[in-house]
Each structure stands twice: as C-alpha cells, then as structure tokens.
C-alpha cells in the first residue's frame, strides 16, 4: 500500500457518504475534477472567513487554487486540499496541521447500472484543540460533504440521472 494511503486505525473520526451515478466509465481523475467544482459559492466565502480566523492561531490556511490552475497529480492542490494519492479508482486529499490531520478519500467502484461514488473523511485530532475544532466544523462538514457529493454525481452523470443514496 502506498505511504500516502491512510490507515483507518490512526483516525478516530471517520464518516462516509455514497451516491450512485449512471456512468460506468469513471475514475479517480474524473472524481477530482468534479470535486473541484462541486462546492457551492457560499463555501468559498466560508473558507475565506475560516482562513482569516484560524491564521491567528497559527493553523494552515493553504493555497486557494482556482479550477483553471488545478494540478491533478500527487502534490498538487484542489483549493486548499493537497492531493496525496491518485490511483485508478481512489484519490486521497488531505493535510497535516498542528491541531489535526485529515484525509478525504474519493473513490469510485462499478455497480449495477453505473458507478458508486464514495466520499470519506478521516480526522486525527492531536489534542483538545483539534477535537474542539472538529466539533465546531462538523455541522457544516456534514452539510457540505453531502451537498458536494450530490453535485459530483449530477455532474458526472449528466448523460443519465444520479442521486444521493440514503
């Protein structure tokens, strides 16, 4: 297993969302491209506000690349998320910071009638401040991750219909 792939046991917080897409010919690169455009406009404003706030505490704010400047390879960035691994059906984004480390796993797998898209978030807080940060961002994280997955499935499956699995 490549070093960039996280080990689940090291991340005490994990969540996962899935969606079905009628396209069967999808790979991780298409997922990354869809991820890069799936955030609603308000998410960018929220991230800019978050960056101004957490910079005062010495936390990473990351580069905010625009969609036209994406580098879809390990070491590149999508927004403030560093691409840590890119395989045929799995992409791992993430960052390690003082308060916590996180990984976003984007995967696609074939299933009857198309593909299953899956987004997992894994977080390893380092201390109470990391747990506090996680508790504060979780409501927005859950809303945004579900919304982004739905938008990814819609964009990737424009030749057919798609929807969020419940």
Predicted ranges, named:
Residues 1-63:
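Hydrophobic ligand-binding cavity/cleft-lining segments
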Residues 58-68, 142-151:
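Low-complexity, charge- and small-residue-enriched intrinsically disordered regions
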Residues 44-51, 55, 130-138, 145:
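Short hydrophobic helices that act as membrane-entry/anchoring signals
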Residues 70-112:
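Hydrophobic-ligand binding "helix-grip"
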Residues 98-135, 139:
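Beta-strand/loop substructures that line and gate deep hydrophobic ligand-binding cavities in soluble
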Residues 12-18, 90, 116-118:
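Intrinsic-disorder/low-complexity, polar/charged segments enriched in Ser/Thr/Lys/Arg/Asp/Glu/Gln
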Residues 39-41, 91, 150:
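Short amphipathic alpha-helical segments with coiled-coil-like heptad repeat character
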Residues 132-166:
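A conserved amphipathic terminal alpha-helix motif
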């Amino acid at each position: 297993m490549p070093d960039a792939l996280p080990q689940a046991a090291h991340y005490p917080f994990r969540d996962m969302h899935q969606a079905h897409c009628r396209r069967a010919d999808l790979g991780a690169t298409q997922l990354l491209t869809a991820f890069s455009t799936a955030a609603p406009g308000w998410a960018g404003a929220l991230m800019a506000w978050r960056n101004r706030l957490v910079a005062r505490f010495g936390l990473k704010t990351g580069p905010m690349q625009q969609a036209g400047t994406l580098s879809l390879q390990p070491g590149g960035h999508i927004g403030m998320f560093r691409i840590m691994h890119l395989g045929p059906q799995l992409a791992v984004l993430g960052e390690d910071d003082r308060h916590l480390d996180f990984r976003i796993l984007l995967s696609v797998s074939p299933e009857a009638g198309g593909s299953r898209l899956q987004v997992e978030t894994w977080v390893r807080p380092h201390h109470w401040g990391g747990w506090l940060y996680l508790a504060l961002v979780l409501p927005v994280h859950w809303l945004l991750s579900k919304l982004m997955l739905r938008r990814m499935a819609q964009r990737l499956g424009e030749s057919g219909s798609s929807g969020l699995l419940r």
